[in-house]
UniProtKB/Swiss-Prot annotation:
Its main location: mitochondrion. Gene3D superfamilies: FAD/NAD(P)-binding domain. Pathway: Porphyrin-containing compound metabolism; protoporphyrin-IX biosynthesis; protoporphyrin-IX from protoporphyrinogen-IX: step 1/1. This is Protoporphyrinogen oxidase. GO terms for cellular component: mitochondrial inner membrane; mitochondrial intermembrane space. Monomer. Homodimer. Its EC number is 1.3.3.4. It is found in: Mitochondrion inner membrane. Belongs to the protoporphyrinogen/coproporphyrinogen oxidase family. Protoporphyrinogen oxidase subfamily. It catalyses: protoporphyrinogen IX + 3 O2 = protoporphyrin IX + 3 H2O2. It comes from Bos taurus (Bovine).
């Protein structure tokens, strides 16, 4: 009788793990268990009354690097090539990104010329930040906060404006608490290997497995900055679900896991609300803190490490305006914490993906709210009403983009504990977990956004590598 692998969590990580398990030459029996009634996790696309697409979670995927190429390969394997909407390298959404500082939008400099001349909100050309990086010695600490690293290597302005904003945009987090080693491993490794971020990124480019497909070649030739799918990014988890069903994978929805216990023969018992499953191996693609509450007493040290990997909430407000125009054309803008503790940034959805605008002319934006403001309100037990979040989002659109008319359509969603926080020393938590799993020979593999990357590409790769480890194949092949 073959092995049974139970995958916990039907977000993109769990779906990817199940997909790669099911495609093995001699696949195990795979059971995917999802607690909610829908698959896809935070990836969710909603169609408005006029057919416009609103993304409640991620809205674009980067094609760059080995992970970006692997996701494009997955898209092709699922037969979705014709659904891809690319943002090509010459498009304003690829070339223009902004910071909102001092009550105004400022274009981030790009190209050599942009680095050599003063570019507000920075007081001097960013060339000097690059020169500082080239002359700064390598750091000696095994980890460092993003703010400390950026200030040491690139200067206080880059740290407090650019990197602060980037941490808010990617992690909805605080650059003074987040780990450079875990949040931006390529920057950390560049310094460790080449003593310089710039040298490391230049000399380290192109490493990793070279994947090939028509879609990958097209993305490289046209220098895509990101891509989406015609019907929204939720098309990807929907296609994965259809594929899994066709391969005989058992997909259980609306079945929250109540507990995990080890049987005498070393198999797992997965307790659901009204039934239970047995598994030879578990891939957990649920949040680390959730898993920590399900583990048996024998895994208390592991549970303790996982419980310290916390996550923050983010509010996403989708706004649609009729007949409105943006003051600038680009991907969107980020807001440093010193400027506005409420607003993380605004994405100009209609610029990147006008094909998703719907039948009537209109402008789609996504306002992201979170950070310390949201954390403080949550800590006080305040009720975060849809009215409050919509009011703050509309105020930001008016103040920062001049959109003073009320929106024609609005969606408000508060994603509770949605983005894991890789705080200083996160790598030690992962090392501790890995050492415990190896020492105890527990048939458990960890996957998902809690560990080594929160982007869609990272989550898909996390699921793929988890499947490879269970199958005993080479994760990098």
């Amino acid at each position: 009788m073959g092995r049974t692998v139970v995958v916990l969590g039907g977000g993109i990580s769990g779906l990817a793990a199940s997909y790669y398990l099911s495609r093995a030459p001699c696949p195990p029996k795979v059971v995917l268990v999802e607690g909610s009634e829908r698959l896809g996790g935070w990836i969710r696309s909603v169609r408005g009354p006029d057919g416009a697409i609103f993304e409640l979670g991620p809205r674009g995927i980067r094609p760059a690097g080995a992970l970006g190429a692997r996701t494009l390969l997955l898209v092709s394997e699922l037969g979705l090539d014709s659904e891809v909407l690319p943002v090509r390298g010459d498009h304003p959404a690829a070339q223009n990104r902004f910071l909102y500082v001092g009550g105004a939008l400022h274009a981030l400099p790009s190209g050599i010329r942009g680095l050599l001349r003063p570019s507000p909100p920075f007081s001097k050309p960013l060339f000097w930040a690059g020169l500082r990086d080239l002359t700064t010695p390598r750091g000696k600490d095994p980890d460092e906060t993003v703010h400390s690293f950026a200030q040491r290597r690139l200067g206080p302005e880059v740290a407090s404006l650019a990197m602060d904003s980037l941490c808010r945009g990617v992690f909805a987090g605080n650059s003074r608490e987040l780990s450079i080693r875990s949040c931006f491993p390529s920057l950390f490794q560049a310094e460790q290997t080449h003593r310089s971020i710039l040298l490391g990124l230049l000399l380290g480019a192109g490493r990793g497995p070279q994947l090939d497909s028509a879609l990958i070649r097209q993305a490289q030739a046209e220098r895509w900055s990101q891509w989406s799918l015609r019907g929204g990014l939720e098309t990807l988890p929907q296609a994965l679900h259809a594929h899994l069903t066709s391969r005989g994978v058992s997909v259980l929805q609306g079945q929250p896991v109540c507990g995990l216990s080890l049987q005498a023969e070393g198999r797992w018992k997965v307790s659901l609300e009204d039934s239970s499953l047995e598994a030879d191996h578990i891939i957990s693609a649920i949040p680390a803190s959730v898993l920590s509450k399900l583990l048996p007493a024998e895994a208390t040290p592991l549970a303790r490490a996982l419980s310290t990997i916390t996550a923050v909430s983010v509010a996403v407000v989708n706004l649609q305006y009729r007949g409105a125009r943006l003051p600038v054309q680009g991907f969107g803008h980020l807001v440093p914490s010193s400027e506005d503790p409420v607003i993380l940034g605004i994405v100009y959805d209609s610029v990147a993906f006008p094909e998703q605008d719907g039948s009537l002319p209109g402008l789609r934006l996504t306002v992201m709210l979170g950070g310390s403001w949201l954390q403080t309100l949550e800590a006080r037990g305040c009720v975060l009403s849809q009215e409050l979040l919509q009011q703050e989002a509309e105020k930001a659109a008016a103040t920062q983009l001049g959109l003073n008319e009320p929106p024609s359509h609005c969606l408000v969603h508060l994603h509770k504990n949605s983005i894991p926080q890789y705080t200083l020393g996160h790598w030690q938590k992962l090392e501790s977990a890995a050492q415990f799993l190896a020492a105890q020979k527990l048939p458990l593999t960890l996957a998902g956004a809690s560990y080594e990357g929160v982007a869609v590409n990272d989550c898909i790769e996390s699921g793929r590598q988890a499947a490879a480890r269970v199958l005993g194949t080479e994760p990098n092949s």
